[in-house]
Amino acid sequence: MTTLASLTRYLSDNGHQVAYALRDIDTAKHFHHPNQYLVYQAPVLGIRGPNTTAAYDCADMLLIRGYEDTPYLKLGVEKWQEIFTDYQPDVVVCDHAPSARLAAYITGIPSYAIGNGFSVPPLTIPLQNLHQLENPD
């Protein structure tokens, strides 16, 4: 949220309408001007994947959240598409919302991801295999 706050303020100050889709909709009460923004409940994909003790990278997190389960993932993407149909965004900016980015891509809406090196990994090919860093003991 704090990552998007300055961007939101800049866009609003320059005449753009901004909407949020939040995992925890109660977060909206902490906004600088809470009545200035539309707020949607973000679709949340719960734990569905393999029982693992550690997620080493974002790909592991996606598996845990059900990204290998096509029908389940499709439901989450369709929920995002419903939000996009209602709001009609010109662009989608996501802070760790891979299903929203997938829905935006399918719908033809430009999207951007912001975040840290975990949710937006560096553009290196191949990515470092973090499983190799695990202590074998």
PLM features: residue spans?
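Active-site-proximal region of nucleotide-activated glycan assembly enzymes
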Residues: 110-137
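Conserved nucleotide-sugar phosphate-binding/catalytic loop shared by glycosyltransferases and other
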Residues: 13-14, 18-71
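Short amphipathic alpha-helix
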Residues: 1-12
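Hydrophobic/aromatic ligand-binding patch that stacks against planar heteroaromatic rings
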Residues: 10, 102-103
